[in-house]
Regions:
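Flexible loop residues that form catalytic
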Residues: 128, 233, 243
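Catalytic beta-strand/loop cores that center a nucleophilic Ser/Cys/Thr
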Residues: 191-233, 240, 270-271
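RNA-binding accessory domains that recognize and position tRNA/RNA substrates
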Residues: 2-118, 130, 147, 245-247, ...
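Cysteine-nucleophile active-site neighborhood
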Residues: 122-206, 247-265
Length: 271
């Protein structure tokens, strides 16, 4: 049952496995076993290029769901965010609409030059599947060019990991990934604990981070990094999902911090 599987994963780490379905209830166990063993796992696998949008688009402006009114549409745009899509969740886009942002969603291999041509007030690095080091083979070069523009940047999950790689850090596959909606995280800046939603199997390695990076959040389960920021620029990221729906919503303030960074940066001439 699920409890015995949980104990197995806890003791031995995440194993390979197959969940199979058959209408007649008959299975070729040897064939399923061979295919399971043959599967190479997520390491070195770039899945962002598989799930990214095939065509750049502008989000239709729907906000997060609210009782009585449902999904209301944002009618006023104060800022323009370009979201790099590594596998973006729609609720992230809805939150940006809540904060009066126009969002241009671009594919994960869109060049830095094309992104800058859109004249964004800020750059968002989305969540997504796969090994960040594999996605980083093309994403790091793009991101480093964007970092030099001194624009506000905000990353979530895979976006957080790619930001760490671009800034000189490294990532690794975890023995036990973080899955669930009740992970306690300590905000080291405000000295507060947040309950967060998480779904990741890779993590940023703290000892590889250069001095220009400050660790802002840590897991209270295993002390792994849950958030970072660049000390001299309006750039930060978190490993978990502040946009999680129906919750927890302890970390929605991160969207406001990104908005505040764009407000401050808007006073400077960028284009």
């Amino acid at each position: 049952d699920t409890r015995s599987l949980t104990n197995l994963i806890r003791d031995k780490g995440a194993p390979k496995g197959t969940i199979a379905f058959s209408k007649n209830g008959k299975f070729n166990i040897s064939k399923l076993t061979r295919s399971t063993i043959k599967w190479g796992g997520l390491k070195n696998l770039d899945l962002a290029e598989v799930v990214t949008t095939p065509k750049n688009y502008i989000w239709k402006g729907l906000q997060t769901w609210k009782k009585e009114i449902g999904f209301k549409k944002n009618r006023k745009n104060l800022f323009h965010v370009v979201a790099i899509d590594y596998g973006i969740k729609k609720n992230i886009l809805r939150y940006f609409s809540d904060f009066k942002c126009k969002v241009s969603v671009v594919s994960c291999k869109t060049s830095a030059e094309k992104i800058i041509d859109l004249k964004p007030n800020g750059i968002f690095l989305s969540n997504g599947p796969g090994d960040p080091a594999a996605t980083g083979k093309y994403a790091i070069e793009i991101l480093n060019k964007l970092i030099k523009k001194n624009l506000p940047i905000f990353g979530i999950c895979l976006g957080h990991q790619i930001l760490a790689l671009a800034l000189g850090g490294k990532t690794k596959k975890m023995k036990l990934g973080h899955r669930g909606a009740n992970h306690p995280v300590k905000n080291l800046i405000y000295d507060k604990v947040e309950i967060t939603s998480q779904n990741h199997g890779f993590v940023v390695v703290e000892e590889t981070l250069p001095k220009k990076i400050e660790v802002t959040h840590k897991s209270l389960f295993d002390s792994t990094i849950e958030g970072i920021r660049l000390k001299n620029k309006p750039i930060f990221s978190v490993q978990y999902h502040p946009e999680s729906n129906p919750g927890p919503q302890d970390s929605v303030y991160l969207f406001q911090e990104f908005i505040n960074n764009m407000k401050k940066n808007a006073k400077k001439k960028r284009y």
